[in-house]
């Protein structure tokens, strides 16, 4: 970078700057074939829960980094994007160094797709991979039949009255997870307000006798040709009954009914921790294959 460039923190992003950042993310996605940041970063653009680092060259936006603070045992996490026309100029390295100086050495720097430029930057900065998140996909055609589960009643999300049970199951099932664990009603409400939210694609499994929630599968539609297994959570007390597989297939059939009805092909994707070998094995049995890997880098040692 040169003396004409700047990398500065902003507490609040003006509306027009948020749009420029979205355009930057879109340009990088088109160039790389993979989005440089996750959906949560897009939700944070209008919030003050995270810190916003903006890189300018000659007054033009060329880079953006979002730094989420540590919380509930999770380290600080950063996601960044550099415009395709402004790479190999040290912008990414400068933003990462700035983020590490604020977040500390435990900060995780995410590289979505783990592309070669990201690996090279990480190596140059002395960062090593500490976490891998797999993206898996399969066609929505020719799905296996969802197996029955004795003593379970399946339903779809009825509204905020279901939130307390969803939170109980989610936070028990994902107590170990840096992003999915520790959810509050605000986390569900925020996603309920998203354009993609569809209560008919949010499946709940209740114990027929007690009425307690045993598990859930929240699906998401990205486009006319792509759906997602957004979250599958099973109460720790209900695991081992095949409920996760049944819920997954119920959601997959819902996505197939919705996306294949127009006669074109459609796929479904999901994200899973690379070291969650049981889940990866289950998804492989259901026909999913790894298509991409997101990697979190951190300071060595």
Curated annotation (Swiss-Prot):
Keyword Acyltransferase: yes
Catalytic activity: 1D-myo-inositol 2-(L-cysteinylamino)-2-deoxy-alpha-D-glucopyranoside + acetyl-CoA = mycothiol + CoA + H(+)
Amino-acid positions noted as binding acetyl-CoA 2 in the UniProt annotation, renumbered to this chain: 232-234, 276-281
Keyword field contains Transferase: yes
CDD domains: NAT_SF
Entry GO MF terms: mycothiol synthase activity; protein-N-terminal-alanine acetyltransferase activity
Short name of any one Pfam family annotated for the protein: Acetyltransf_1
InterPro entries given in the database record: Acyl_CoA_acyltransferase, GNAT_dom, MshD_Acetyltransferase, Mycothiol_AcTrfase
EC numbers, comma separated: 2.3.1.189
Residue ranges occupied by any N-acetyltransferase domain in the UniProt entry: 7-150, 152-301
Residue numbers binding acetyl-CoA 1: 80-82, 88-93
GO biological process: mycothiol biosynthetic process
Top-level class of the enzyme under EC nomenclature: transferase
Protein keywords: Acyltransferase, Repeat, Transferase
Binding site for 1D-myo-inositol 2-(L-cysteinylamino)-2-deoxy-alpha-D-glucopyranoside: 39, 179, 220, 228, 271
Function: Catalyzes the transfer of acetyl from acetyl-CoA to desacetylmycothiol (Cys-GlcN-Ins) to form mycothiol.
UniProt xrefs under HAMAP family: MshD
Classification via PANTHER family: L-AMINO ACID N-ACETYLTRANSFERASE (PTHR43617), MYCOTHIOL ACETYLTRANSFERASE (PTHR43617:SF31)
Subunit structure: Monomer.
Family listed: Belongs to the acetyltransferase family. MshD subfamily.
Protein name per UniProt: Mycothiol acetyltransferase
Organism: Mycolicibacterium vanbaalenii (strain DSM 7251 / JCM 13017 / BCRC 16820 / KCTC 9966 / NRRL B-24157 / PYR-1) (Mycobacterium vanbaalenii)
């Amino acid at each position: 970078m040169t003396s004409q460039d700047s990398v500065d923190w902003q507490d609040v992003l003006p509306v027009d700057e948020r749009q420029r950042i979205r355009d930057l993310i879109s340009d990088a996605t088109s160039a790389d074939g993979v989005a440089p940041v996750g959906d949560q970063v897009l939700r944070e653009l209008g919030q003050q829960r995270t810190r916003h680092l903006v890189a300018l060259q000659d007054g033009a936006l060329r880079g953006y980094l979002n730094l989420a603070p540590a919380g509930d045992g999770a380290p600080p996490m950063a996601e960044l994007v550099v415009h395709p026309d402004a790479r190999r100029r040290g912008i990414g390295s400068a933003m990462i160094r700035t983020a590490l100086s604020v977040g500390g050495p435990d900060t995780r720097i995410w590289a979505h797709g783990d592309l070669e430029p990201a690996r090279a930057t990480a190596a140059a900065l002395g960062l090593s991979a500490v976490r891998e998140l797999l993206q898996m996909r399969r066609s929505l055609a020719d799905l296996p039949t969802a197996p029955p589960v004795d003593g379970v009643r399946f339903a779809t999300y009825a509204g905020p009255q279901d939130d307390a049970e969803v939170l109980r199951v989610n936070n028990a099932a994902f107590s170990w997870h840096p992003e999915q664990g520790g959810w509050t009603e605000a986390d569900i409400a925020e996603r309920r307000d998203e354009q993609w939210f569809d209560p008919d694609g949010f499946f709940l499994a209740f114990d027929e006798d007690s009425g307690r929630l045993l598990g859930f599968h929240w699906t998401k539609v990205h486009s006319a040709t792509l759906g997602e297994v957004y979250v599958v959570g099973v109460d720790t007390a209900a695991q081992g009954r095949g409920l996760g597989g049944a819920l997954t297939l119920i959601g997959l059939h819902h996505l197939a009914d919705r996306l294949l009805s127009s006669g074109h092909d459609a796929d479904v994707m999901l994200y899973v921790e690379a070291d969650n070998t049981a889940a990866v094995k289950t998804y492989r049995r259901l026909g999913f294959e790894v298509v991409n890997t997101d990697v979190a880098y951190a300071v060595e040692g």
